[in-house]
Each structure stands twice: as C-alpha cells, then as structure tokens.
C-alpha cells in the first residue's frame, strides 16, 4: 500500500517545491526486468522514460518497510525523498499525516471512546442524579456511534481506492469529516450533552439551592450559545454557504469553548485541592486525584496548542468528543468517590448534613416547627431561666399581666406568674405568623401546594395498596382454613375412599351424672341402715 505525501487533512497552500519525478526521468537504453512476466522476463528497451505516480503534483512513496536492496535509486529520486522527509511543507511535515499515522490515531480514539462508553454504563449510578447520568450515557453512545460510523466509512473508501488505483490516499479522512452531515450532527449533539453534564457536575459542588440554580442557569445558557455557534460553523462549511460575516465566527466559537473548558477545569482542580483533607489518607484517591487534574487540564491545553500550532486541526472533529468524554467521565467519578467519603464523615459526626435556615422558609422545617409548637416544655427550668435572663433588666418587671389574656396567663408556669412578669406572647408560640405580602403568599402556594398534593396522593396510593394486601391476605387465610378442613375430612380424595378411626367419646355431662348416681346410692344405703322400714313406731 502506498501513501501520498499530500496526505494532509488541511487545505494545501502554494507549492514551494516541484517534484521532478512527477514530470518523468529519462533513463536511456537498458534492460527492463519484469519478474511477474515469465514470457518476457528480461527485455531490452531504448529511450526508457520513467515517471512516478503523483497525486496533485506530489509523488506517492511506498509506506511498507522493505528489505535493503543493493540497487541504488537515481539521484533525482533521492533528492526528492530528502526534501520530503527533512523539510517542512505547507502546514508541517507530511509524514505526520501519513495514512498509517492517521489510522493509528483514529484507532486509539475509537478504543478509548468505546471503553469509556462501556464504563459509563457499568459504573455511573443513577442515584439522585438520574437526568445527569442519562445525559452522560447518551452522549457517550453518540460519541461512540460517530467514531464507529466514521471509521467504517473511511476504511471502506480506502479499500475501494486500493482496489481501483492500487494506492490509498489519506485525504479520505479529511474529506469525510468536512462533508458528512451525519458525523457532524452526532459530534455536535454529543458535545452539547457533555457540556450539560459538566454544568450538572459543577452544580453538585454547591450545597445551597440558590447557588445551584445560578450555576444551572448560567451554565445552561453558555452551553446553548456554544452549541448554536458550533452548529452554524459546522453546517455552513458542509452545505457550502459562503458568508463574509461568518468568517470570525469560527475562531470566536473555538475561543468560547476554550473559555468554558478552562472554567470547568479550574473549578474541578479547586475542588480537588479544597477537599484534600477528606481524601489525603486514601491511596486510591491520590491516583484518582492526579488523573482527574491531568485529564481536566488536558482539554484546554490541547485546544490552546491547536490554536497556536494547528496541532489538532486534522483530528479536531474526533479528538474534541474524546476530550469531552474523558474529562466528564473522570470528573463524575471523582465527585462520586468524594461524595461517599463526605457521607461517611457526616455519619460519624453529631451535626450531620448542613441545614440553611433561609432555604427552609416555606418548606418542611417551618411547617414542622409550627405543628410542634404545642410540644414545647413550658414548665422546664430552662425556659424559666431564659425568660428571667431576657427580662431581668427590663421595665416589664413592673407590669403585672397587663398584656396577657386570661387564657394566656393560665398557660404560664406557676413560678413565672408569681413573679408578676408579663410577656407580649405566649411562651410556647413560634413567631412564624407575620403578615406576608401577596408575592410571599403566591410563592408559598407555588411551593407548598404540589408537595401537599404529592403527599396526599402518595398516602391514598399506600392506603389502597395496604387495603388490597389485607383483603388478599384475609382471602388467602380463609381459603387455607377451608382447604385444611377439607383435607382432614377426606374431601380432597379423588377416589372417594374414606378411612375413619373409631374412638370412645366421653362427655363431661356423662361423668357428672354417673358420679351423682353413685353418691345417691351410698346415701340411701346409709339411711336404710339407720331407719328400718318396720321400726318407725318404736321411736
């Protein structure tokens, strides 16, 4: 298989060197040896002229490693070859964009992308972040599908070229990437979903709801803007639309993506450094921390290198999804591991998870306090000492129940009533019942009503489920009892054969009757012995 030195994926510039072997070389008279033709193995020829197979004025060289031959190449061919391997061309040396080099690069990208896709399905758990895990898996599948479709199409085209021309040109990869709409669409969708996953990962670092909403709002808008810019640049180039106003859009989109990736890398690295006390005692977390820092910094570093030297422009359409896949997956894995360590530390502590009071307004914490205000211990010594400390230096010591109703005064402890201290409110009253604005009522209704409906529907479903299970259990118990009785009576015998055991049954009433009869007979015999029938008149 031969490789063209014109196998650059970039747009060629002006040619600075003209290869003479493409115009032909006069070899003169001599013998022509053709080992494949046995009939005319050696032929004498005159005025032999030889020209190399060239592609757009650039010769094709054999890419295979052949054995050393004692024959020497003509000086013209050697000069062209030296120019090919030692001099820079339009945008760099062509050897870096040879066919085998490109195949090795894309094969590596394919293996890494597919492996990370499989790992995302095996290791990424849903948990409380179902949407994020779904987006991560979907974007991984799209990236894998894109690279598989790209390699399949490119290799089939190279195979046809080899069969038809006897050579293969690496321009197939660049042409396919710059013209195929399917690959462009898959790459755009995968990178957009990866950016949304990165926004969700950054939002997980903030515990407060307000900060979480700000991150999601700003990050979501930035991701959508980046997606729109990338879509415009990609589709205008592939469809063939030329607009002078869109010339600066492509570099602006690239710089915008670099800024987003730099922010993401900075936040992840800051989190790794900020949580070092949590993972510093675990050896595996050391490896994961170093890997996370290296990979999240790799994306902006590669993009910046591409801007400065054009390093990735030939592979940008496939390297960019790979970099997003690696950084997103590793950052997700880091957060999962550090979250487990934090939860383990919170379980050991007394306080547990943090609760912010301003976030609980209108939520369960406030409702719990209001519903349990009657459970406060108003007769405890702590309340008495608290109120004594509050009003020790106050003028309210001289007021004797002027602000309390009879019902509120009766609810006070006996020790406090005897001191003559008056309070503006009841002891066990929690002051949540302040006058609220219409916006507060509307916000409270918006947040509380769906929660109440959810709780009510959940209780109804649980009650119906419990009732159905109870009825089912009762029916099963009743059927079991009937079956047991039928089995004891022999009613389950299909052959209608019944065997009974005979047994004397003695009832308790029969035993009592026999004992009473025996006692009566004994009593009559004793009476007859003392009072004979004919001796009554002698008494």
UniProtKB/Swiss-Prot annotation:
Name listed for the protein in its UniProt record: pH-response regulator protein palH/RIM21
Classification via InterPro entries: PalH
Q: Name one GO cellular component term.
A: plasma membrane
Its keywords, alphabetically, are: Cell membrane, Membrane, Transmembrane, Transmembrane helix
The gene for this chain is RIM21
* Compartment(s): Cell membrane
TM ranges? 102-122, 131-151, 173-193, 214-234, 249-269, 285-305, 311-331
Q: What does this protein do?
A: Required for the proteolytic cleavage of the transcription factor RIM101 in response to alkaline ambient pH.
Which cysteines form disulfides? none
User: Which residue spans belong to the Extracellular compartment?
Assistant: 1-101, 152-172, 235-248, 306-310
Is Cell membrane included in the keywords of this UniProt record?
Answer: yes
The membrane-topology field of this record reads: Multi-pass membrane protein
